[in-house]
Amino acid sequence: VDDSRVASSLDAEGLRQRLNGLRTSDLFSFVEPNRVGRIASVPNDGYFQDGTLWGLRNAGQNGGTPGADIGVTNAWDITIGSTNVIVAVIDTGIRYTHSDLASQMWRNPGETAGDNQDNDKNGFVDDVFGINAVNNTGDPLDDNGHGTRVAGIIASAANNGRPHVGVAWNVRLMALKAGNSAGQFLSADVAQCVYYAVTNGA
Protein backbone atom coordinates (compact mmCIF):
# COMPACT_ATOMS: atom_id res chain seq x y z
CA VAL A 1 0.00 0.00 0.00
CA ASP A 2 1.47 3.36 -1.05
CA ASP A 3 0.51 5.28 2.06
CA SER A 4 1.67 2.70 4.64
CA ARG A 5 4.51 3.42 7.05
CA VAL A 6 6.68 1.24 9.29
CA ALA A 7 8.12 2.71 12.48
CA SER A 8 10.51 1.02 14.88
CA SER A 9 10.97 1.19 18.62
CA LEU A 10 13.67 -0.26 20.85
CA ASP A 11 11.60 -1.60 23.72
CA ALA A 12 8.14 -3.02 24.39
CA GLU A 13 6.96 -0.08 26.53
CA GLY A 14 8.11 2.47 23.95
CA LEU A 15 6.33 0.53 21.22
CA ARG A 16 3.13 0.34 23.28
CA GLN A 17 3.19 4.11 23.91
CA ARG A 18 3.88 4.89 20.26
CA LEU A 19 1.05 2.62 19.09
CA ASN A 20 -1.43 4.19 21.52
CA GLY A 21 -0.38 7.69 20.43
CA LEU A 22 -0.77 6.88 16.74
CA ARG A 23 -4.12 5.14 17.24
CA THR A 24 -5.62 8.13 19.05
CA SER A 25 -4.26 10.69 16.56
CA ASP A 26 -6.97 10.05 13.93
CA LEU A 27 -4.24 10.27 11.28
CA PHE A 28 -4.35 6.57 10.42
CA SER A 29 -7.04 4.04 9.57
CA PHE A 30 -5.08 1.16 11.12
CA VAL A 31 -2.13 1.06 13.51
CA GLU A 32 -0.76 -2.40 14.29
CA PRO A 33 2.56 -3.79 15.48
CA ASN A 34 4.67 -5.39 12.75
CA ARG A 35 4.90 -8.89 14.23
CA VAL A 36 7.38 -11.60 13.32
CA GLY A 37 5.85 -14.86 12.16
CA ARG A 38 7.39 -18.17 11.24
CA ILE A 39 6.37 -21.54 9.91
CA ALA A 40 5.34 -23.83 12.75
CA SER A 41 7.87 -26.46 13.79
CA VAL A 42 5.43 -29.35 13.99
CA PRO A 43 7.03 -32.71 13.15
CA ASN A 44 5.49 -35.32 10.88
CA ASP A 45 6.17 -38.29 13.18
CA GLY A 46 3.23 -40.69 13.30
CA TYR A 47 2.43 -40.86 17.01
CA PHE A 48 2.54 -37.08 17.30
CA GLN A 49 0.26 -36.65 14.30
CA ASP A 50 -2.30 -39.29 15.34
CA GLY A 51 -2.49 -38.11 18.96
CA THR A 52 -0.89 -41.14 20.60
CA LEU A 53 1.63 -38.79 22.23
CA TRP A 54 -1.21 -36.96 23.98
CA GLY A 55 1.15 -35.57 26.64
CA LEU A 56 2.70 -33.41 23.93
CA ARG A 57 -0.52 -32.31 22.25
CA ASN A 58 -3.89 -33.23 23.73
CA ALA A 59 -6.86 -32.39 21.53
CA GLY A 60 -9.23 -34.54 23.59
CA GLN A 61 -8.47 -37.75 21.73
CA ASN A 62 -9.28 -41.05 23.44
CA GLY A 63 -11.50 -39.30 25.98
CA GLY A 64 -8.72 -37.00 27.18
CA THR A 65 -9.06 -33.41 28.30
CA PRO A 66 -8.21 -30.97 25.50
CA GLY A 67 -5.22 -28.85 26.41
CA ALA A 68 -4.07 -31.14 29.25
CA ASP A 69 -0.57 -31.40 27.84
CA ILE A 70 2.79 -29.65 28.09
CA GLY A 71 2.06 -27.18 25.28
CA VAL A 72 4.97 -28.46 23.22
CA THR A 73 3.91 -26.81 19.97
CA ASN A 74 4.20 -23.40 21.64
CA ALA A 75 7.66 -24.36 22.90
CA TRP A 76 8.67 -25.51 19.41
CA ASP A 77 7.81 -22.05 18.12
CA ILE A 78 10.66 -20.83 20.34
CA THR A 79 13.16 -23.69 19.99
CA ILE A 80 13.54 -27.36 19.12
CA GLY A 81 16.75 -27.54 21.10
CA SER A 82 20.33 -27.03 20.02
CA THR A 83 23.06 -29.49 19.08
CA ASN A 84 25.27 -27.45 21.42
CA VAL A 85 23.15 -28.57 24.39
CA ILE A 86 24.12 -31.89 25.99
CA VAL A 87 21.44 -33.46 28.19
CA ALA A 88 22.77 -35.96 30.73
CA VAL A 89 20.28 -38.79 31.20
CA ILE A 90 21.16 -40.37 34.56
CA ASP A 91 19.02 -43.48 34.55
CA THR A 92 19.31 -47.16 33.58
CA GLY A 93 21.32 -46.29 30.47
CA ILE A 94 20.15 -45.65 26.91
CA ARG A 95 19.73 -48.09 24.04
CA TYR A 96 21.95 -45.90 21.89
CA THR A 97 21.40 -48.17 18.86
CA HIS A 98 17.65 -47.35 18.80
CA SER A 99 16.60 -45.92 15.43
CA ASP A 100 15.10 -42.81 17.07
CA LEU A 101 18.09 -42.23 19.38
CA ALA A 102 21.27 -43.24 17.52
CA SER A 103 21.52 -39.89 15.72
CA GLN A 104 20.76 -37.99 18.94
CA MET A 105 23.64 -39.32 21.01
CA TRP A 106 26.46 -37.17 22.34
CA ARG A 107 29.84 -38.52 21.31
CA ASN A 108 32.90 -38.20 23.52
CA PRO A 109 35.42 -36.31 21.36
CA GLY A 110 38.34 -37.72 23.35
CA GLU A 111 37.47 -41.37 22.78
CA THR A 112 37.97 -43.65 19.77
CA ALA A 113 35.12 -46.15 19.46
CA GLY A 114 35.97 -49.83 19.55
CA ASP A 115 39.73 -49.61 20.07
CA ASN A 116 39.49 -51.00 23.63
CA GLN A 117 41.58 -48.11 24.96
CA ASP A 118 40.98 -45.34 27.48
CA ASN A 119 41.96 -42.65 24.97
CA ASP A 120 40.97 -39.69 27.15
CA LYS A 121 42.52 -41.22 30.31
CA ASN A 122 39.39 -40.72 32.41
CA GLY A 123 39.26 -44.28 33.76
CA PHE A 124 36.67 -45.61 31.29
CA VAL A 125 37.49 -47.63 28.18
CA ASP A 126 35.49 -46.69 25.05
CA ASP A 127 33.13 -44.29 26.86
CA VAL A 128 31.87 -42.98 23.53
CA PHE A 129 28.27 -42.24 24.60
CA GLY A 130 28.75 -41.98 28.37
CA ILE A 131 29.48 -44.40 31.21
CA ASN A 132 28.10 -47.34 33.12
CA ALA A 133 28.69 -46.48 36.78
CA VAL A 134 27.02 -49.72 37.89
CA ASN A 135 29.77 -51.88 36.33
CA ASN A 136 32.44 -49.16 36.00
CA THR A 137 32.66 -49.50 32.22
CA GLY A 138 32.32 -47.19 29.26
CA ASP A 139 29.21 -48.94 27.93
CA PRO A 140 25.96 -47.33 29.17
CA LEU A 141 23.65 -49.67 27.21
CA ASP A 142 20.21 -49.87 28.84
CA ASP A 143 19.24 -53.31 30.20
CA ASN A 144 16.03 -52.12 31.87
CA GLY A 145 14.25 -49.89 29.35
CA HIS A 146 13.41 -46.95 31.60
CA GLY A 147 16.38 -44.81 30.59
CA THR A 148 15.66 -45.39 26.90
CA ARG A 149 12.06 -44.24 27.33
CA VAL A 150 13.20 -41.13 29.22
CA ALA A 151 15.76 -40.37 26.50
CA GLY A 152 13.06 -40.75 23.85
CA ILE A 153 10.77 -38.30 25.62
CA ILE A 154 13.62 -35.80 25.73
CA ALA A 155 15.13 -36.06 22.27
CA SER A 156 13.70 -38.77 20.03
CA ALA A 157 14.53 -37.82 16.42
CA ALA A 158 11.90 -35.90 14.44
CA ASN A 159 10.69 -36.01 10.85
CA ASN A 160 12.27 -39.40 10.21
CA GLY A 161 9.24 -41.51 9.37
CA ARG A 162 9.32 -43.18 12.79
CA PRO A 163 6.40 -42.89 15.22
CA HIS A 164 8.00 -40.96 18.10
CA VAL A 165 9.30 -37.43 18.55
CA GLY A 166 11.10 -35.88 21.52
CA VAL A 167 10.39 -32.59 23.23
CA ALA A 168 13.80 -31.12 22.30
CA TRP A 169 14.76 -33.20 19.29
CA ASN A 170 17.85 -31.17 18.42
CA VAL A 171 19.79 -31.69 21.67
CA ARG A 172 22.42 -34.38 22.25
CA LEU A 173 21.95 -37.16 24.82
CA MET A 174 24.71 -38.31 27.17
CA ALA A 175 23.97 -41.81 28.50
CA LEU A 176 24.88 -42.19 32.17
CA LYS A 177 23.92 -45.56 33.61
CA ALA A 178 23.44 -45.39 37.38
CA GLY A 179 20.54 -47.86 37.61
CA ASN A 180 20.84 -51.62 37.21
CA SER A 181 18.58 -53.98 35.27
CA ALA A 182 16.13 -54.09 38.20
CA GLY A 183 15.93 -50.29 38.27
CA GLN A 184 17.89 -49.94 41.53
CA PHE A 185 20.28 -47.01 42.00
CA LEU A 186 23.16 -46.46 44.41
CA SER A 187 23.80 -42.85 45.40
CA ALA A 188 27.55 -43.31 44.76
CA ASP A 189 26.80 -44.34 41.16
CA VAL A 190 24.52 -41.34 40.68
CA ALA A 191 27.26 -39.05 42.05
CA GLN A 192 29.80 -40.57 39.66
CA CYS A 193 27.42 -39.91 36.75
CA VAL A 194 26.87 -36.31 37.84
CA TYR A 195 30.63 -35.78 38.01
CA TYR A 196 31.10 -37.28 34.53
CA ALA A 197 28.30 -35.11 33.12
CA VAL A 198 29.71 -31.88 34.54
CA THR A 199 33.25 -32.78 33.49
CA ASN A 200 32.10 -33.43 29.92
CA GLY A 201 29.95 -30.36 29.34
CA ALA A 202 26.41 -31.51 30.10
Which residues make up each language-model segment?
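Short linear motifs at secondary-structure transitions and domain/linker junctions
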Residues: 4-8, 56-66, 148-154
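Short, acidic/polar
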Residues: 15-19, 189-193
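Hydrophobic C-terminal alpha-helix "anchor/cap" residues
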Residues: 19-23, 154, 197
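Generic alpha-helical hydrophobic packing signal
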Residues: 33, 172-174, 196
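Subtilisin-like serine protease catalytic core
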Residues: 63, 73-188, 200
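Short acidic, glycine-rich surface-loop motifs adjacent to enzyme active sites
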Residues: 194-202
